[in-house]
Structures are given as structure tokens and as C-alpha cells.
Swiss-Prot record:
Coiled coil: none annotated. It is found in: Cytoplasm. It comes from the Bacteria. Residues 3-90 form the HPr domain. Belongs to the HPr family. PROSITE patterns: PTS_HPR_DOM, PTS_HPR_HIS. Gene3D superfamilies: HPr-like. It comes from Shewanella violacea (strain JCM 10179 / CIP 106290 / LMG 19151 / DSS12). Keywords: Cytoplasm, Phosphotransferase system. This is Phosphocarrier protein NPr. Component of the phosphoenolpyruvate-dependent nitrogen-metabolic phosphotransferase system (nitrogen-metabolic PTS), that seems to be involved in regulating nitrogen metabolism. The phosphoryl group from phosphoenolpyruvate (PEP) is transferred to the phosphoryl carrier protein NPr by enzyme I-Ntr. Phospho-NPr then transfers it to EIIA-Ntr. Could function in the transcriptional regulation of sigma-54 dependent operons in conjunction with the NPr (PtsO) and EIIA-Ntr (PtsN) proteins. The active site is at residue 17. Pfam families: PTS-HPr. Its main location: cytoplasm.
Amino acid sequence: MTKLERQVTICNKLGLHARAATKLAILASEFDAEITIVQGEKKASAASVLGLLMLETGMGKTITLLGKGQDADAALDAICALVDAKFDEAS
């Protein structure tokens, strides 16, 4: 099975905080894919809010999205769009 990889920069003011992590985890869970988020030496399942929070990803940090599974391409597209939209937050 092919593994896909994308990079995206966190651009919202508060970074990957609880509300943003929850939105990302809910979105990732909607796809038939295993998505892993990597930031530096840390990695977490995109479906785990706690794991995402433990990445301690702030504004300006670049994360790598790794995906595998039937819907991996669509999942990575959707997650990149969410991050680029600043998790639908005002800042």
C-alpha cells in the first residue's frame, strides 16, 4: 500500500490547541485511512486529540502528514485545507 506524505504549516495564532486538535481528529476519523502527524521527533495519530496535543505544535511550525489507506489522499487534502483555513478560527 502506497504511503502519502504532505507538509503544512500551522498558521493560526494558538497553534494546535484543544479545539483545533479536536476538529482535526474528528475530520481524520471520517476517512478510511491511517493518518499520522509528525512534528520534529514527535508523532501522533491524527485521530487522537491527546496525541495531537502532545505534539506541542505552535504557530509557524511545519507538520508532516503521513497517510495510508483507501481514502488517504482525500484525508490529507481535507486536513491540509483545515490547517490552511486556520481551523476555521478568527485568528
